[in-house]
């Protein structure tokens, strides 16, 4: 009776999920951040999965969703294909979505190098009408949803526990990064997008080969003796020279060269391979995971491309005399919407508290926002000219063009280092 796990299972109740540090942009999920970065740093590089639960007794939309880091999506989709019938809580079948978001503790855990997932809770009207209000009460408790989530994640926990190598598929990250790369902006800014495109394509193919090896090892080993596979030593995986391929991408351009990609991994090498995979996962989090001013998880080159697009459009609008259109674009850049509504002291405070503090205060937001541009003088100057009916925007155009050049330079450097 019961279940005897192969791995150590830890059950954590995190503190300070909603608030944990005063006067910081990143004041939530501080308990989870401190738990893994300060209290238990030894978890990093050894824990193979974090399963987070948010409102598991509430129906969110018409189906259950598991929101995951990109690297676990392949395994999760395969898991759903073999899922037995569960308590009928939703009219539609369960789906996987990615990436994870900053709104729950799994983000703090993931950037520490621990692959994470959560029952997706951001869908449905409840989040807009009841969540975090006096209208959020036990009347929304749904017994079937609660039971279904226990069944779903209980089976998932056992499926992960049965793996002998952490089932991370890095190809999806490389593919998504490639899809987000805009060749037009590479051409406009002089960034070497073709090099990055080649590297990402090669990394995608090689990561798929590596995952096939891991998948076969897990499928055939389960609780059996994996040492019976009798294949060549695989300890060289993910340790070859990276050349000019970049800190993360290069690990995949050569990591399966010289190995039989159809073969399983010998039992003696599974832990070594697992450590390598978790190390690469950490590198991917450090390299590819950035956030915009409002906590949305994005690729770094995607953030810069969007900012360049808005800047280019604002300059064009001003040259055409379309002031309102230019202001709408500036409103969308970083925190500059504050410049439309508040005095400069307020603007500077709410900019500084997200950028100019130590890591112990910025927590999981440390270094995640890139390329901020202060357009308070530009915005207030344009608003004043709008009141006066002035149509000479020469000064503001010059300031925006200078910002465009700074962003272009940052974009080139980012493309060169990915």
Which residues fall in each region the model found?
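Secretory-pathway/membrane protein signature
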Residues: 1-418
């Amino acid at each position: 009776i019961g279940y005897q796990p192969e791995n150590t299972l830890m059950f954590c109740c995190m503190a300070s999920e909603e608030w944990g540090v005063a006067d910081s942009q990143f004041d939530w999920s501080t308990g989870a951040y401190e738990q893994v970065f300060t209290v238990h740093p030894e978890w990093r590089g050894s824990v193979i999965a974090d399963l987070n639960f948010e409102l598991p007794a509430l129906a969110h939309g018409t189906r259950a969703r598991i929101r995951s880091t990109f690297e676990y999506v392949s395994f999760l989709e395969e898991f759903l294909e073999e899922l037995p019938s569960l308590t009928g809580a939703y009219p539609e079948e369960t789906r996987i979505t990615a990436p994870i978001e900053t709104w729950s503790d799994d983000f703090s855990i993931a950037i520490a190098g621990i692959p994470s997932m959560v029952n997706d809770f951001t869908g449905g009207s409840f989040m807009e009408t009841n969540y975090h209000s006096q209208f959020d009460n036990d009347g929304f408790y749904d017994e079937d949803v609660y039971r279904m989530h226990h069944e779903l994640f209980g089976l998932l926990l056992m499926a992960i526990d049965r793996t002998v190598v952490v089932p991370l598929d890095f190809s999806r990250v490389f593919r998504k990064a490639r899809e987000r790369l805009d060749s037009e902006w590479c051409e406009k800014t002089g960034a070497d997008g073709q090099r990055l495109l080649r590297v990402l394509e090669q990394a995608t193919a090689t990561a798929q080969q590596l995952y096939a090896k891991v998948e076969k090892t897990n499928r055939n080993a389960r609780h059996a003796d994996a040492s019976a596979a009798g294949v060549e030593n695989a300890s060289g995986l993910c340790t070859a020279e990276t050349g000019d391929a970049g800190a993360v991408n290069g690990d995949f351009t050569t990591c399966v060269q010289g190995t039989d990609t159809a073969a399983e991994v010998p039992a003696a090498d599974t832990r070594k391979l697992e450590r390598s995979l978790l190390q690469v996962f950490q590198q991917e989090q450090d390299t590819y995971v950035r956030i915009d001013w409002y906590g949305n998880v994005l690729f770094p080159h995607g953030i810069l491309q969007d900012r360049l697009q808005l800047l280019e459009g604002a300059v064009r609008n001003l040259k055409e005399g379309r002031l309102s259109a230019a202001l709408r674009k500036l409103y969308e850049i970083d925190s500059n919407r504050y410049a439309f509504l508040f005095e400069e002291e307020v603007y500077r405070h709410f900019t500084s508290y997200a950028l100019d503090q130590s890591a112990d205060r910025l927590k999981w937001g440390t270094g995640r926002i890139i390329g901020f541009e202060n357009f308070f003088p530009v915005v207030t100057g344009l608003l004043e000219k709008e009141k006066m009916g002035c149509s000479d925007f020469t000064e503001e155009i010059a300031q925006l063009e200078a910002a465009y050049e700074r962003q272009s330079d940052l974009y080139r450097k980012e493309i060169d280092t990915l």
